[in-house]
Amino acid sequence: MPTLDSLVCPKCHGPLTAHAGRELRCTRDGVRYPVVDGIPSFIIPGPDPVALPGCALSLVLPALNEGENLDRVLPELKQALVALGPTYEIIVVDGGSRDGTQEIVRKHGARLVSQKLPGFGGAYRAGFEQARGEYVITLDADGSHDPKFLKDLWAARRDGDVVIASRYVQGGAAEMPATRRVMSRILNTTFGRGLSLPVHDLSSGYRLYRSAILRELELKATDFDVLEEILIRVLAAGYRVHEVPFRYRARVSGRSHARLVRFAISYLRTFVAMWRLRNSIASSDYDGRAYDSVIPLQRYWQRGRYRAITQLASGSHDVLDVGCGSSRIIGAIPGMIGLDIQLHKLRYARRYGNALVHGSIFELPFANGSFDCVICSEVVEHIPALEKPFDELARVLKTGGRLILGTPDYDRWRWRALEWLYGRLSPGGYADEHITHYTRANLGPYLQGKGFAIEGVEYVGGSEMIFSLKKLGPMVSPVSARSVQTAHRADRAAPAA
């Protein structure tokens, strides 16, 4: 978390105090701001009274005619949980068993939940809805997941938002028929490489989750593909996934309920849907992954922007990146603070090791003159042409400090052509959210009127302009934001050259 010396209430600029590590409070008017996943948020409403979980851990076991296995597995689970120590509940989600599963579950004191939606995915959703624990562990009811491994998952709960018992990391193994092993490897390779996922075992059902995360997910999959969907949606939301080595053993009795044709169709459907998500700007790591994109133009653009901005910011001590997203720029300078309005992008950016703030360019939660360098790249074109954002950027910058401001130059035919082309070739990766079209001719004089001296303007791809500006002091702008907005409307109406 950034130091309280730099953070202030965005409403009144009053000082803040920390309370129990979960919120900040304004000392002037008592406004409360939550700390979410270690990130101070000035967007999310102040925290409500904490709703305590019903227990520390919920175990969720989907079951369909697994009575014989459950009669052996449930006592082993209870024994392992008692030795582990946390308060717990065991939930068995029954998909309409006809082998006495219900009686066996009641005999061993577990909670029985009747499945309403079809398939393995429906069982998961039913279990997640009923789970009362702070953490949830899912495992199979057929005995293939060793209850003794619960302690390993529980011990790793602080290492990730999701912890996977992984067969495919060093130290893991899988005892299964050769055909099934080959299919599992093909499945994991297809999803892992096809979707650029930083996970080795995507199909393991033996996992630990923070239950708060599960409540955020809008799951669609109905079969075993729900396992991949959960992980991909978790990663898209910026959460961390951790794997611990696990030795998988074959089911003790009975037969698998997977059906090959239905299995293949459901996985194909989920792969297509998740490919669209992974390659859209909605994915938390979109900015970061673009740096290494397989698309040459995207890779060139990201690296050109990174190089230009980091060179301009080098040597600065107190740096703020407004609208940092998940770009690698936030990790380029030690001690830099990143601010963005999208919390899931900030969750991903935690890996860069710098301080992060969930806030808005319209109300920056920092004291006047806090920074000797402020970066604002690819932001102002997404918001109306108003005075407030530019005033805020100037306010938090020290006199003599540098503002690095990047935005497309809509006077350049290259940008208009690229925007048109990219929007059609990769509609998921480009959102037509540019509501203000700036040009060098209208933005330069406006910034000078705001008290900035233009030190230079660099271009990425001959069309994205990056201003290097020195703050001289406050001035009354002869060019108003309204006139810039009028100019950009005229630009939008003009045909591309």
What is the meaning of each model-derived region?
Residues 1-10, 21-51, 275-367, 373, ...:
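Conserved N-terminal segment of class I S-adenosyl-L-methionine
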Residues 41-76:
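N-proximal low-complexity "stem/linker" segments adjacent to membrane-targeting elements
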Residues 48-57, 194-197, 219-296, 403, ...:
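Hydrophobic helical membrane-anchoring modules
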Residues 76-86:
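Short, acidic, metal-binding catalytic loop of nucleotide-sugar glycosyltransferases
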Residues 94-102:
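A conserved acidic beta->alpha catalytic loop
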Residues 115-130, 135-138, 144-224, 251-261, ...:
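Acceptor/aglycone-binding surface of glycosyltransferases and processive sugar-polymer synthases
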Residues 376-379:
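A short beta-strand submotif of the Rossmann-like class I SAM-dependent methyltransferase core
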Residues 387-399:
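A short glycine-rich, Lys/Arg-flanked "PGG" loop and its adjoining helix->strand segment in the class I
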